[in-house]
A protein has these predicted regions:
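Residue-level signature of outer-membrane beta-barrel architecture
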Residues: 22, 28, 59-63, 94-97, ...
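Transmembrane beta-barrel strands of outer-membrane/channel proteins
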Residues: 32-38, 70-74, 104-106, 159-163, ...
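Hydrophobic, lipid-facing positions within transmembrane beta-strands of outer-membrane proteins
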Residues: 51-57, 88-91, 142-146, 196-200, ...
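Outer membrane beta-barrel
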Residues: 60-177, 207, 361
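Repeated loop/turn-to-beta-strand initiation elements of outer-membrane beta-barrel proteins
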Residues: 65-70, 100-102, 154-157, 208-211, ...
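Detector for outer-membrane/organellar transmembrane beta-barrel domains
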Residues: 243-329
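Outer-membrane beta-barrel "beta-signal"
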Residues: 312, 356, 371-383
Length: 383
């Protein structure tokens, strides 16, 4: 713990930005944050659900059109001891000019227009070590690969290649309050060229509408139980998304067809995934957002499942206090996970956040966590 604190102080002592005087010289930018997060179960035995502190450092080196970006964490986790230590987040080299944008290395790749739901956005897997009781950006796992994008005024074309796939991080240790149990997970695909992921996305930005088409040859990133063992298999995703502003509203839509997707039990079948979302910027610092995602699997008895989200946020006290509720609603089984938070900015760098996570479910995806409702507090200092 002492070494983590010392390195944290060193990070904070580094100047936030060092800028060269001419464009052809090397430019260096250093920034990051220190945060600490603690959560307690509201039901008996009122134990700690999470207790972790972190230093995040981000360094950008740039000269001309080329550069490199590295972000890393130093973590102390009082509950999950194996999570304590150094964690490389992203590390990639890039080249960017008026039309070309190339990134090679460990990076987070996002597709689609869905908010905290995965339809076409299936390249970067998820860290479910604490399920969804983390910031969504922290849940994404970077992948090592190449991303090439060519942009024009009204469209761009993106191609991706991931030689070695990354997969969901699932909590199976009983010492973790978020454990799903001792589920055996099969071997990940061998590191061979024929197992690489590849795909592309074509996006258009027109007056009154943005839309895109995407395709990806990939794997099921979350293991599927087959004869009691979690397995990974090949699948292909074909998708499209759109976003349309209408006055104070934004209408979002997304659809993804998963071809030859592995189903529970080992069968393979196509599945259709569709989402409709509506954002309302109501004025007076109010924002409301609702989504409904539906999945149809062309196999078995339970072919249809539905999941909704609802986000409501309001800024108060000259935008120093941000109130928000974000809920996942299991339409199929009636469960809900609702994260409420109050974020108060003590100054431009220091934030204090108080929150409550509510789980309520008798069956379905949230039932395993029905006793995990928690009260949490977070402090964050940015530098």
């Amino acid at each position: 713990m002492k070494s983590v604190i010392i390195i944290a102080l060193l990070w904070c002592a580094i100047p936030r930005a060092v800028l060269a005087q001419d464009e052809d010289s090397l430019r260096i930018d250093v920034k990051g944050f220190v945060d600490t997060y603690h959560a307690m179960r509201v039901e008996r035995p009122n134990d700690w659900m999470s207790s972790r502190s972190r230093v995040r450092g981000e360094v950008t080196l740039e000269k001309g059109h080329a550069g490199a970006f590295v972000s890393a964490n130093l973590i102390y986790n009082a509950i999950l001891k194996d999570r304590t230590g150094f964690q490389l987040r992203e590390a990639y080299a890039y080249y960017s000019d008026d039309h070309w944008d190339v990134r090679a290395g460990r990076q987070i790749i996002t597709w689609g227009v869905a908010d905290a739901l995965r339809l076409t956005d299936i390249i970067s897997p998820m860290d479910y070590t604490e399920f969804l009781a983390q910031d969504y950006d922290d849940i994404r796992i970077p992948v090592g690969g190449l991303r090439l994008r060519y942009s024009r005024e009204k469209w761009n074309l993106e191609a991706v290649a991931i030689p070695v796939s990354s997969f969901f991080d699932l909590p199976t240790d009983d010492r973790n309050p978020w454990s799903i149990g001792p589920v055996p997970i099969g071997d990940e695909p061998k590191h061979r060229l024929y197992n690489m992921e590849y795909g592309g996305r074509l996006s258009f930005f027109l007056s009154g509408i943005d839309f895109s088409f995407s395709a990806l040859h990939t794997w099921n990133k979350q293991p599927v139980l087959c004869n009691g063992v979690g397995e990974y298999h090949r699948m292909t995703m074909l998708g499209a998304d759109m976003s349309v502003p209408v006055g104070k509203f934004v209408v979002r839509g997304e659809v993804a067809e998963y071809l030859d997707e592995l189903q529970t039990g080992g069968s393979r079948a196509a599945s259709t995934n569709a989402l409709l979302g509506l954002d309302w910027y109501a004025g007076n610092d109010w924002t409301l957002s609702a989504q409904y995602a539906h999945k149809y699997v062309a196999l078995g008895e339970h072919r249809n499942t539905g999941l909704s989200t609802l986000r409501i946020s309001k800024d108060l006290l000259h935008n120093t206090l941000a109130l928000q509720t974000f809920a996942y609603i299991d339409v199929t089984n009636g469960g809900v996970f609702n994260r409420l938070s109050a974020d108060y900015a003590l100054n431009d760098q220091l934030h204090a956040i108080l929150g409550y996570d509510l789980f309520h479910a008798d069956s379905g995806m949230f039932a395993i966590y029905k006793k995990n409702s928690e009260l949490w507090v977070k402090l964050k200092y940015s530098f």
